[in-house]
Amino acid sequence: MKQQQKIVWSGADERKRQSKPFDGEKVYDACIIGGGVIGCAIARELSRWQLSLGLLEMRSDVSEGTSKANSAIIHAGYDAKPGSEKARTNVAGNQLFEPLCRELHVPFRRNTSLVVAFSSDGLAGLRELKSRGEINGVDGLSILSQAELRRREPAIGPSAAGALLAETGGICSPYELTIALAAHAVLNGLDLQLNCKVGQIRHDGRWFHLQTSRGPVRCQVLINAAGVYADTIHNQLSRQPIEITPRRGEYWLLDKSVSDAFSATIFQLPTAMGKGILVSPTVDGTMLLGPTAEDIDDKDDVRTTAQRLDEILRVAAKTWPDLPRGQFITSFAGLRAHARQNDFILGEVADCPGLINAAGIESPGLTAAPAIGIELARLAARRLNAPRRSQWQPAWQPPQPFRLMETEQRARAVRDNPAWGRIICRCEQVTEAEIRAAINRPVGAATVDGIKRRTRAGMGRCQASFCTPRVLAILSEELGVSRLELTKFGNGSRILTGRIGETVRSHEPPAADAAAGGLEVSHD
């Protein structure tokens, strides 16, 4: 195996730190609210300057909001309105994406995208998108005839009349990218604070004073990357309010057995509510259908609904008539932060110097993240008059996944560490060694979902029904806590309620030790 960087993170120590109140007030030059891909991209770029930097995330891990539940598409940039922040940062971000993923060791594939017209009337819409894309500076756009489209994608529906090909379209793993951005920032001095929900904020003209669930925070520059909660942050400090509406999108995910159905990401012509229902491969070999678009009031409502999931199947059938309904392995939903002006809200707030917004970040926010990160980090550094750091640590490289190793690599890995030979997740071929490394790494996992997003354990066809008890046992051992205390995604989402044969009140703290057996699964 290739020699890996020395692990510099103790999962057990970090879990204890992230669950305790602060020892006094935290003071930073700059502080970011929000640990999604935007907040972490800003943090990574801002760690290039000599300043004290904090990031506050209310959940138990980074990438727990919009950044974990989206289409994972790197958009070319033809859809955004020319002259908008979306158009500008989309095209710039697309150009930055491939080298960024290479540097951070994150999977990325430029698989191209196709916008399909399903009638001759729709061909005019394709020409309009192509013209818009060219105004935005997008390269590699062309119109395909029906015959050319079928040669590229034989499974496309019979009513497809033509398509817009975008050669710069791509796919990535958004949660792996977010975790890697955060880890790189931490290696370069970021003070990441999880389980840290921001409440009241005031500005005294020089300092921002934040009350959080773990204690007080003070900073000179405050960067608002709070996703669907960005209006809650902004409106405490500015007399010019903004409004963010949660727009829920639901998805279906299909098994790897149908991964070769389409090579490109297939869009239908977009509407005012978004880019419509897509059919897309993922970098992990599964197939994704969705999303829907439903404006809601609840900023935490990520339920799936039978009505919307049926809508996906009905609309996607036009793209994929032979859609194999027996190959679905899960469904999920995510929220997009939709601003009233239908554009990103970026930059320093006019009536609150030092407050920098990254608000209203919906599609193409993932694509735009590298460009937004650079732009807003430079803005913050200029306001603080901070000098550039002379040294910057390279990104941490995780071990190569066992499933991607050649036979000789696997044999060598097992000889060096027998834990490489113990398969924990059969569907995704994830080993014990990978799970332990995912806990004891920069920005390591402390939950079952944290393990899932760092290793793919639990993401396969059985959806964690086999590996969950084994993952819990390893987490318990590495973190030094009872399995009864472990959660799926933090915030009280405990998986186990007690030992079989015992009565455990749901609100009492667990008293079992980490090695206790005979545990009962929660079905709440």
Q: What residue ranges belong to the model's regions?
A:
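Extreme N-terminal leader/targeting segments of oxidoreductases
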Residues: 1-30, 48
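N-terminal Rossmann-like FAD-binding beta1-loop-alpha1 element of flavoenzymes
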Residues: 28-55
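Flavin-dependent oxidoreductases
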Residues: 41, 201-206, 210-290, 294-305, ...
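Glycine-rich FAD pyrophosphate-binding loop
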Residues: 47-69
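Dinucleotide-binding Rossmann-like beta1-alpha1 core, especially the glycine-rich loop
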Residues: 72-152, 276-277
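Short beta-strand to alpha-helix junction loop
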Residues: 82, 86-91, 116-125, 164-183, ...
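Helical element adjacent to the flavin cofactor pocket in flavoenzyme catalytic cores
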Residues: 164-221
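C-terminal catalytic lobe of FAD-dependent flavoproteins
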Residues: 180, 270, 274, 283-284, ...
